[in-house]
Amino acid sequence: MALLRGVWGVLNALGKSGADLCAGCGSRLRYPFSFAYVPKWFSSSLSGYPKKPMTSYVRFSKEQLPIFKAQNPDAKNSELIKKIAKLWRELPDSEKKIYEDAYRADWQVYKEEINRIQEQLTPSQMVSLEKEIMQKRLKKKALIKKRELTMLGKPKRPRSAYNIFIAERFQEARDGTSQVKLKAINENWKNLSNSQKQVYIQLAKDDKIRYYNEMKSWEEQMMEVGREDLIRRSIKYPAKNDPEKF
C-alpha cells in the first residue's frame, strides 16, 4: 500500500500536460505533453497514460484564442493573453460555472482512469515506471518550461555583438557547409577594426534596452494573468556605458 501511495504521488506530480502548466495564464502548449515517461509494455497494454484535464480558465482561453487571433492577426500571443484574461475577469459567474463544471467532470473521469491503470500494474511494473519517471522528469520539465515560455511570448534574450555579426554574415554566405561558413565568419570578425566592431557593439547595447523594455511589459502581463511564478526576483537594468563582451 505504501508503494502504491508513493507511485501515485509521483504520477500525480509528474503526469502534467502543457495545458495544466499554463493554468491561469490564458494559453496552452500547442501539443500536449506529459512529464511521465511511459514504457512500451505500459503503453501497449494500457493504451497510454491519461493527461490531466484543462482547468476552467485554460478551457476558456483555448476557445477564445483562435477568435482573438482572427480579429488581431498581427498581435503577439502575450497581447492576446492579456485581452483574454481581461475578458475572463469580466465574465459573469453564471458563465464561468459552465467551464468550472466541465473541469470537475473531466477531473472525475481522469481520477477513475488513473485508478484503472494502477489496478492493472504489478508491483514490479510500478517500481520500473517510477524509476523511468524520475530519470526523465528534469529533462521533460525543462523542455516543457521552455516551450511554455515561448508560447507565452517571453522576449528573446539580447544578443552579443559577435552573435549579431554572425547572424548577419551567415545569411549572406552561400558556399560551403555551416561549419565552413562559421569558420570563415569568425576569421572575418577577428580581422575587423575596433571602429567596425563598434557598430555591432552599439547594436548589442540597443538590443539589451529592447530586451529590458519587452521583459518589463511581459512581466506586467504575467502579473495580470496570475503567473507571478514567471517574474524575475531581481531585475538588472541596462547600464548606459556597459562594456560589451565579445
UniProtKB/Swiss-Prot annotation:
Domain of life: Eukaryota
UniProt PTM: Phosphorylation by PKA within the HMG box 1 impairs DNA binding and promotes degradation by the AAA+ Lon protease.
Family matches, as CDD domains: HMG-box_TFAM_rpt2
PANTHER family: HIGH MOBILITY GROUP PROTEIN DSP1, TRANSCRIPTION FACTOR A, MITOCHONDRIAL
InterPro entries: HMG_box_dom, HMG_box_dom_sf, HMGB
Notes on the domains: Binds DNA via its HMG boxes. When bound to the mitochondrial light strand promoter, bends DNA into a U-turn shape, each HMG box bending the DNA by 90 degrees.
Organism (species): Bos taurus (Bovine)
GO molecular function per UniProt: chromatin binding; DNA binding, bending; mitochondrial promoter sequence-specific DNA binding; mitochondrial transcription factor activity; transcription cis-regulatory region binding
One Pfam family hit: HMG_box
PROSITE patterns documented for this protein: HMG_BOX_2
Compartment(s) where it occurs, according to its Swiss-Prot or TrEMBL record: Mitochondrion; Mitochondrion matrix, Mitochondrion nucleoid
Quaternary structure (record): Monomer; binds DNA as a monomer. Homodimer. Component of the mitochondrial transcription initiation complex, composed at least of TFB2M, TFAM and POLRMT. In this complex TFAM recruits POLRMT to the promoter whereas TFB2M induces structural changes in POLRMT to enable promoter opening and trapping of the DNA non-template strand. Upon metabolic stress, forms a complex composed of FOXO3, SIRT3, TFAM and POLRMT. Interacts with TFB1M and TFB2M. Interacts with CLPX; this enhances DNA-binding.
Function: Binds to the mitochondrial light strand promoter and functions in mitochondrial transcription regulation. Component of the mitochondrial transcription initiation complex, composed at least of TFB2M, TFAM and POLRMT that is required for basal transcription of mitochondrial DNA. In this complex, TFAM recruits POLRMT to a specific promoter whereas TFB2M induces structural changes in POLRMT to enable promoter opening and trapping of the DNA non-template strand. Required for accurate and efficient promoter recognition by the mitochondrial RNA polymerase.
Site residues, Intercalates between bases and promotes DNA bending: 58, 182
Gene Ontology BP terms: mitochondrial transcription; positive regulation of DNA-templated transcription; regulation of transcription by RNA polymerase II; transcription initiation at mitochondrial promoter
Post-translational modification Phosphoserine, affected residues: 56, 61, 160, 193, 195
Originating gene: TFAM
Name recorded for this polypeptide: Transcription factor A, mitochondrial
Extent of the transit peptide: 1-42
Chief localization: mitochondrion
